[in-house]
Curated annotation (Swiss-Prot):
This enzyme is involved in nucleotide metabolism: it produces dUMP, the immediate precursor of thymidine nucleotides and it decreases the intracellular concentration of dUTP so that uracil cannot be incorporated into DNA. It catalyses: dUTP + H2O = dUMP + diphosphate + H(+). Keywords: Hydrolase, Magnesium, Metal-binding, Nucleotide metabolism. This is Deoxyuridine 5'-triphosphate nucleotidohydrolase. The gene is dut. Its EC number is 3.6.1.23. Substrate binds at R65, S66, G67, N78, T82, I83, D84, K92. GO terms for biological process: dUMP biosynthetic process; dUTP catabolic process. Pathway: Pyrimidine metabolism; dUMP biosynthesis; dUMP from dCTP (dUTP route): step 2/2.
Amino acid sequence: MLNIKIVRLHPLATLPAYATAHAAGMDVAACLEAPVSVAPFSTALIPTGFALELPIGYEAQLRPRSGLALRSMISLPNTPATIDADYRGEVKVILINYGKEPFMVQHGDRIAQMVIARVEQVQFEEVAELSATVRGEGGFGHTGIASVQ
């Protein structure tokens, strides 16, 4: 198992944790001095009270929690949000309220999930053209919505 260094920046911060034995993502909780209201169609930057030291070659991805999206229309506008291996500041979550009512975030609310993923830096090779494929340039719904039999 990969060990990642974490610093609790606030004494009441809840550190990320897996909710089930085989969960891919860890729940990330808000660390607030006072509740934050996220107005409809607005965003709020929510602190978590912790910072990470990720190994080179890894990133942390912040993703929405499905229950918040389903019940309250709360998501992350930049999903997945990337935390780079060389970032040492507090992890913060941008929440967006797609709902019609204000959404209150309380201290300790689980507001996102975090997945640790391997990443690789690449080098581009500029060429005059790309190799041909059956798909070609088809994209953005080119296969339709009906099930494929």
